[in-house]
Amino acid sequence: IRLSLVGSEMCIRDSSIRARCGVEMVAHLTCVSSTRETVRARIEAMHEAGVENVLALRGDLPAELAGADRSAWPYRYATDLIGDLRASGYGFCIGAACYPEVHPESANQREDIRRLKEKVDAGCSFLTTQMFFDNGLLYNFLYKIREAGITVPVIAGIMPITSATQIERAIRLSG
């Protein structure tokens, strides 16, 4: 379930699914180019709707913002969003994304793991990987993050393939 500008409606849908089906849901909250006020409103809406689990993501940069100066943005990284979720005091179980094949904006895996550690230190309780195609890369990644002191659970991100277009888009977005 993604939260949009009408986040409270999406949160209510999330709570309804949990109540009817007994299935824990994880709200996906993105913050790319968002204001603190917008994000605070979404956090409040999630809390009021009884959302407990949040996957905190920066989100994909829209094409028109690809070259923009992001230095003044309140949410340059998911870490900023994780900090605000934790500071809300609502006790969300906060997850974040990780990249066994290195985030496309990272210079290298060492930098990527350093940023991942920052997410965990900011209050992330679990990680879910981006889609990957080589189990060896995942095992190597898990070894390296454990070596870096990252001990939270890691969930392998699995996406059922339904079309060639879907997989091509996923590959483009994940670098």
Predicted regions located by residue number:
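Active-site glycine-rich loop that binds ribose-phosphate moieties when present
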Residues: 105-122, 127
